[in-house]
């Protein structure tokens, strides 16, 4: 099957594809890339956020911790996950699993597809800002490799909380930005209908972000899930092999230097 990018797409088209119904799901990625996945639930404080799937799996025969944002497929599931927008319990669950991975010296792989953190009243009352900030602080110094893959929307701090790893990759039909094009257009021009124009200005596409060294590479997409999973596996194998060679102190120093560039 041909790549989705046979013809160069506009930023607006890439945004539409990142949000599209054909986008591979969290569950499909788990089944296609990893073996023996064991899901772990709860943040050990308050709740288990369905917008975050996390647990332990095998990748190429070795244990890894996997964390994915989950938009859901059915209408009922999407309501339960707030369309993939995590609550504080989701960020705290992910951090619990990352600290567990550090304890057992397992690398961490995150897959991100979220418009951003859930903005509801309950999230604010339960410390949404603190939960995101805690993830950023703790992951910056965790002593195991953290590989992040944005496979759809990468929205604001809600996405950054999972993408502050050693290596960040994007699917070719994905986006990564501080806010949505609609939000950008509404703030800058007081006209959300100019979202397509905003998408071009924001430089939120994988190609632009790679040029600016915000990300480390682009994963080609295909309508064939088997081909897509092979591409993901190739990248993960390459990146894990690279970062597992480093000592814990070198790993943390390199990660912190990466983000100090910005």
Label every PLM stretch briefly.
Residues 1-186, 190, 200-262:
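Terminal-region recognition feature
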């Amino acid at each position: 099957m041909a790549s989705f990018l046979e013809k160069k797409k506009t930023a607006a088209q890439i945004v539409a594809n990142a949000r599209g119904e054909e986008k591979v799901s969290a569950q499909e990625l788990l089944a296609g890339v990893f073996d023996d996945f064991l899901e772990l639930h709860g943040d050990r404080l308050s709740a288990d956020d369905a917008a975050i799937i996390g647990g332990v799996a095998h990748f190429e025969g070795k244990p890894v911790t996997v964390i994915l944002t989950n938009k859901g497929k059915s209408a009922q599931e999407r309501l339960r996950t707030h369309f993939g927008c995590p609550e504080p319990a989701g960020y705290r669950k992910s951090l619990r699993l990352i600290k567990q991975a550090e304890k057992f010296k397992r690398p961490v792989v995150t897959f991100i597809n979220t418009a951003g953190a859930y903005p509801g009243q309950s999230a604010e009352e339960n410390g949404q800002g603190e939960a995101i900030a805690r993830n950023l602080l703790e992951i910056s110094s965790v002593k195991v490799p953290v590989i992040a893959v944005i496979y759809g929307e990468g929205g604001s701090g809600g996405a950054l909380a999972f993408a502050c790893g050693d290596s960040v990759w994007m699917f070719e039909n994905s986006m990564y930005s501080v806010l949505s094009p609609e939000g950008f257009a509404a703030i800058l021009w007081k006209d959300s209908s100019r979202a397509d124009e905003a998408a071009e200005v924001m430089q939120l596409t994988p190609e632009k972000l790679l040029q600016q060294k915000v990300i480390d590479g682009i994963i080609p997409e295909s309508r064939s899930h088997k081909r897509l999973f092979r591409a993901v596996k190739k990248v993960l194998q390459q990146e894990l092999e690279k970062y597992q060679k480093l000592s814990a102190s070198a790993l943390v120093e390199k990660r912190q230097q990466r983000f100090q560039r910005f």
